[in-house]
Amino acid sequence: MSRIGRKPIPVPQGVEVKVEGTTVTVKGPKGSLTREFHPDMKITFDGSQILVERPSDEKEHKALHGLTRTLINNMIVGVTNGYQKSLELVGVGYRAAKQGRKLVLTVGYSHPVEMDPPEGIEIEVPAQNQIIVKGIDKELVGNFAATIRAVREPEPYKGKGIKYTDEVIRRKAGKTGGKGKK
């Protein structure tokens, strides 16, 4: 079992951290994030690093310990570097376009699908078959990218649909052309 919760979280230069009870606020060059954590977790900040401590070795507290540490680390990485997910559209006539803040997808339905990104999410469309979702909140970026993918998930026969750029689609063989019924 990993002991990730015990590792201190280094705070880089230019990042401001405020810990008030169970609420942690992180401000950095890309923006600021605030999150409420479980009341059992003790979070301390000594100027250069953040430490997360658990009250006991119960299973629930062990799980929360690692989770809390990782969430705080994700906040720090988000406000310094940000997060991004890239998707690609595979299929004839499948394309994405940006209209103002909206994302418009043409993916084989009788109508174009319009999507409004949540606050704090930025969308780029470098090519008509590529979408890049950017933001400082890892959870929001992942959720919105998954929502886009869910509009037309890749199918296993031809691979048509919206997929993550690094995703590998498991393909299936089609029906073999045998003799038909008479």
Curated annotation (Swiss-Prot):
Q: Which domain of life is it from?
A: Bacteria
Under the heading InterPro entries, the entry gives: Ribosomal_uL6-like (IPR000702), Ribosomal_uL6-like_a/b-dom_sf (IPR036789), Ribosomal_uL6_a/b-dom (IPR020040), Ribosomal_uL6_bac-type (IPR019906), Ribosomal_uL6_CS (IPR002358)
Question: Which UniProt keyword terms apply here?
Answer: Ribonucleoprotein, Ribosomal protein, RNA-binding, rRNA-binding
**GO CC terms:** cytosolic large ribosomal subunit
Q: Which GO terms of type biological process are on file? A: cytoplasmic translation
Disulfide-linked positions: none
What's a single GO MF annotation on this record?
structural constituent of ribosome
Q: Does the keyword RNA-binding apply?
A: yes
- Function field: This protein binds to the 23S rRNA, and is important in its secondary structure. It is located near the subunit interface in the base of the L7/L12 stalk, and near the tRNA binding site of the peptidyltransferase center.
Enumerate the HAMAP family for this protein: Ribosomal_uL6_B (MF_01365_B)
| Subunit structure and binding partners | Part of the 50S ribosomal subunit.
Q: Which family does it belong to?
A: Belongs to the universal ribosomal protein uL6 family.
Q: What is this protein called?
A: Large ribosomal subunit protein uL6
Species assigned in the record:
Carboxydothermus hydrogenoformans (strain ATCC BAA-161 / DSM 6008 / Z-2901)
The gene coding this protein: rplF
